[in-house]
Structures are given as structure tokens and as C-alpha cells.
């Protein structure tokens, strides 16, 4: 009889939990946390700092103007053809040399974000709210992974990839990628900035056995990923904290991460290699004193989220971005922007190819292109990564 009573109580508790679980989670999900951002250098034009924006992106040539919605990332193949994702779940290919002709290369679904070619010519993509996908040269779409190991302390199942964002591929074929937040799907990515909880993670997918492993956890919106030129480490962006980290794959620091750039005036997005041994980084937006102040007052943000309609919330300034070049040590080399915001206000990606830089933006309706002064006119990403393998 006692056992029967215990079972009845357990069932009752379980039913009440299932019925009210959403209320508990909603209470948690509207609870922003405290963050004190460090002081930063000015990005104002003419300020004389390494971050001072110019107007270089404003005069970039437009590719696919009016044909595209949301080319978050861009990439080029060995034939100089240009690829990007769209918010309609498509991978679009623009044909070289003038990029005036295009086609839907593949329909993946979701929102294709980060892109990378592997050694076999497969186009690998982080697809928002869906997972990591591969598109073969024959356009066959294959899901690689959609989950990782669940955290032991999680109330909600966080094994599913909610916002897979960017990726890069090591020489051994392993795919390193970010899942920006455990709390929001890709279409609600900006809401993560309001709470600013450290739930972003860095993961690795091994094609040899199909396994997915979480390498790092507890970052504020992990974003861009880029293998270092020597492949002994990788860089990844922590957007809401305005930092760039290096994760070591080899050597005495293997398995450990260190911050190489901190307290930037902009929110970092994708990172890619440059032909001169340095790296390109996109800024999706710029810090403001008002939003920085709000991060120190989580109660205010909680009241805002509960009492105001979303179109009246205070969000980060994602209407002004840019492109930054930095070196192995994290020193800033140059910064470029679109001061008027007419062509490339928000930049989420850039890709160097044969002396030109191609610009993508998740809220944009075009891809930008301009010549890079002093760049190697023969350098390409596929050749730098895979040499004569393909």
C-alpha cells in the first residue's frame, strides 16, 4: 500500500510538472543577467584609433542587388563562382566572372548561415534551427548532425542545436562550429542579447565516426570560427562580449582557450583568413553607452521584456557594422565601414578571393565586392586550405 501511495504521489508530481513546466521555463527565460562591459577605444571616423571607421564599404560593387534576402555568409569555389545562403532556405550560386547570372544551387531549408568547402568539394553549412548540413557537388543535401551531448544540469534538453552559426574545417576533416545559444532558435537570435546569458558553445563534428562533441561552453553568443593559418589553433568570436578567442588544437595549450582581443567597440561575427597571413573579422553592430549601461541593470531589462512590446525594446545597435583586419597576436591592422549605412550597414561576413573582398550581411539584399589594395591576386580560400587535394 505504501508503495502504491508513493507511486501515486510521484505520478501526480510528474503530471503537475509537465503541466506547469512551461511556466517555470518562461520565468527563467525572461531573466537577464548582469554584465559589466569594459571600456573600449573609439570607432569614430578620424579618432586616430585602430578601430576608426572609414567609408570604404559604401563604394563596394553590388552583386545580386534585389535578388537576395539575407546572405549571411559568402564563399567562392575553385572556379571563382560565388555562393551564399538566403532566409528562404536556399543556397544561391552566382557565376563567374561577372556574377550577373545566378541559380538556386540547393534548397536546404531553415536559414543557411556559415559556409565552408571541405577537401572533397562538399559545401558544408550551419543551418539555423536545423543543424550541420552537407551539399555535394551533385547538389545532394545530407544532414551531418543536429545534436550534441546534453548538459547534466539543464532543465530543458539542450542537446539539440538551436542556433548553429559558423564553421571551419581542419586538415583532418573535422568540422569545428558554433552553436550560439541554447536558449533561442536562429530566428530569435537577437533576443539572446537582451538576456546576455553565457550559453554559447564551440563544438566539433568528426565525419569519421559521425560524433559531435562539445569542446567549450559558457560564452556569450559564440559566432565566427576560423582555422589559424598553421592549423594548430582556431579563432572564434564571442559576439555579445565583444571578444575574440583562440582555441588550441595542438601543443602544450591543446584543449584550452585564451582571449586574444577584448573590449572591442563592435560585436564580432564571422572570421576568415586573409592572403597576407592575417584575418578578416565582420562587425554585425556597434556598442553604445546606453546598451552597455543596460547590461549592468538586469532588472530593468526584465521589466522591459515583460511590460513593453518587442518593437520598443532596447536592442544592441546592429545598424552600423564594419570589417576589421587583425593579426595572429590580436593586433588591429585596419577597420572599414559604411558610414551612411546605405549599402552595408550590418556586416556578418567577408571572404577574400583573388585580390577582392566579398561582403555579406544577414539583413542585406546584396553582396558587396571591392578590390583590396596590396592583396595577392592569386590567393584563394580553397587553395589555401586544401592545396592540390581537390
Predicted regions, residues:
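Surface loop/turn motifs at the tips and blade-to-blade linkers of beta-strand repeat domains
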Residues: 62-67, 104-109, 144-160, 215-220, ...
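Short, conserved, GDST-rich strand-edge loop motifs in beta-rich repeat architectures
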Residues: 177-197, 284-317, 369
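Conserved beta-propeller blade signature
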Residues: 81-83, 122-124, 174-176, 233-236, ...
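Asp-box/WD-like beta-propeller blade repeats and closely related beta-sheet repeat scaffolds
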Residues: 126-192, 199-200
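Residue-level detector of Asp-centered blade-edge/turn motifs that repeat once per structural unit
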Residues: 76-79, 117-120, 169-172, 229-231, ...
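Blade-loop segments of beta-propeller domains
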Residues: 87-134, 145-154
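Blade/loop signatures of beta-propeller domains
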Residues: 17-61, 196-197, 320-322, 326-329
Amino acid at each position: 500500500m505504501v508503495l502504491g501511495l508513493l507511486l501515486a504521489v510521484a505520478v501526480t508530481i510528474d503530471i503537475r510538472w509537465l503541466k506547469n513546466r512551461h511556466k517555470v521555463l518562461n520565468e527563467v527565460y525572461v531573466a537577464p543577467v548582469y554584465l559589466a562591459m569594459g571600456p573600449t577605444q573609439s570607432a569614430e571616423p578620424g579618432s586616430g584609433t585602430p578601430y576608426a571607421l572609414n567609408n570604404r564599404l559604401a563604394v563596394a560593387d553590388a552583386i545580386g542587388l534585389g535578388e537576395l534576402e539575407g546572405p549571411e555568409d559568402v564563399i567562392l569555389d575553385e572556379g571563382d563562382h560565388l555562393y551564399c545562403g538566403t532566409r528562404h532556405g536556399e543556397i544561391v550560386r552566382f557565376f563567374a566572372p561577372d556574377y550577373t547570372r545566378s541559380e538556386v544551387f540547393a534548397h536546404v531549408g531553415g536559414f543557411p548561415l556559415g559556409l565552408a568547402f571541405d577537401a572533397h568539394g562538399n559545401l558544408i553549412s550551419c543551418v539555423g534551427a536545423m543543424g550541420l548540413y552537407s551539399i555535394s557537388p551533385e547538389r545532394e543535401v545530407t544532414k551531418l548532425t543536429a545534436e550534441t551531448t546534453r548538459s547534466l544540469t539543464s532543465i530543458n534538453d539542450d542537446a539539440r542545436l538551436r542556433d548553429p552559426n559558423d564553421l571551419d574545417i581542419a586538415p583532418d576533416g573535422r568540422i569545428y562550429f558554433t552553436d550560439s545559444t541554447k536558449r533561442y532558435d536562429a530566428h530569435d537570435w537577437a533576443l539572446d542579447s537582451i538576456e546576455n546569458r553565457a550559453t554559447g558553445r564551440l563544438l566539433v563534428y568528426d565525419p569519421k565516426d559521425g560524433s559531435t562533441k562539445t569542446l567549450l561552453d559558457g560564452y556569450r553568443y559564440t559566432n565566427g570560427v576560423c582555422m589559424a593559418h598553421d592549423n594548430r589553433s582556431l579563432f572564434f568570436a564571442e559576439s555579445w562580449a565583444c571578444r575574440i578567442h583562440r582555441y588550441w588544437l595542438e601543443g602544450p595549450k591543446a584543449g584550452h582557450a585564451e582571449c586574444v582581443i577584448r573590449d572591442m567597440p563592435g560585436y564580432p561575427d564571422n572570421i576568415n583568413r586573409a592572403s597576407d597571413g592575417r584575418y578578416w573579422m565582420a562587425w554585425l553592430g556597434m556598442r553604445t553607452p546606453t546598451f552597455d549601461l543596460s547590461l549592468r541593470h538586469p532588472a530593468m531589462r526584465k521589466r522591459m521584456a515583460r511590460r513593453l512590446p518587442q518593437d520598443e525594446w532596447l536592442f544592441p545597435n546592429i545598424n552600423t557594422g564594419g570589417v576589421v583586419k587583425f593579426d595572429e597576436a590580436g593586433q588591429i591592422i585596419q577597420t572599414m565601414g559604411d558610414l551612411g549605412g546605405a549599402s552595408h550597414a550590418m556586416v556578418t561576413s567577408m571572404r577574400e578571393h583573388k585580390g577582392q573582398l566579398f561582403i555579406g550581411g544577414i539583413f542585406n539584399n546584396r553582396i558587396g565586392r571591392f578590390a583590396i589594395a596590396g592583396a595577392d591576386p592569386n590567393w584563394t580560400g580553397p587553395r589555401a586550405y586544401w592545396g592540390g587535394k581537390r
